[in-house]
Amino acid sequence: MIKKSILLVDDDQRLRELLKDYLNEKNFQVFTSEDFDEAKEILGFFIFDLIILDRMMPTGDGINLIQDIKKVSKTPIIMLTAMSENNDKIDGLKTGTDDYLSKPFEPEELFLRINNLLKLYENVNNTELLFSFGNFIYNTKTNL
């Protein structure tokens, strides 16, 4: 089974290490970045199944990075941040983040949110492979 890949962007080194270890144990391949500039560089070379990012970091606001990502990709994004006010959550969701989780959080909750998003996006991607013509449905992946 191929491991799903996650890019984790957060300036908190301890949190990055803990989440990387936890998600590796859950059978994910996790790449980390400590700032948005590094994350943009990584995203220029690799495609990830999911991105987790902090909103406020020394190099900028995660909202801007989300907007850049969503212009070119359908990759699901979870915003993981200490900004927990309702208007912060609404701003994040308006810009295209797929889920919003406030710190502090339970790792299992993050794991469940990741799985739910990956299942949802997998189903969406699978339906894009189907074409119908009259009473016939053609699957472009299996050619059936």
Feature-to-residue mapping (PLM):
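Two-component/phosphorelay signaling modules centered on CheY-like receiver
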Residues: Q13-F31
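Short, Lys/Arg-enriched segments at the junction into DNA-binding effector domains
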Residues: K4-S5, N116-L144
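Active-site residues of response regulator receiver
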Residues: D54, T81
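Short hydrophobic/Thr-rich beta-strand motif most characteristic of the beta2 strand and flanking loop
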Residues: N27-F36, I42
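Conserved phosphotransfer cores of two-component systems
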Residues: G44-F46, D68-T75, T95
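The feature encodes the CheY-like receiver
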Residues: R16, P58, E85, K103
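Acidic catalytic/metal-coordinating carboxylates
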Residues: D35, D61-N64
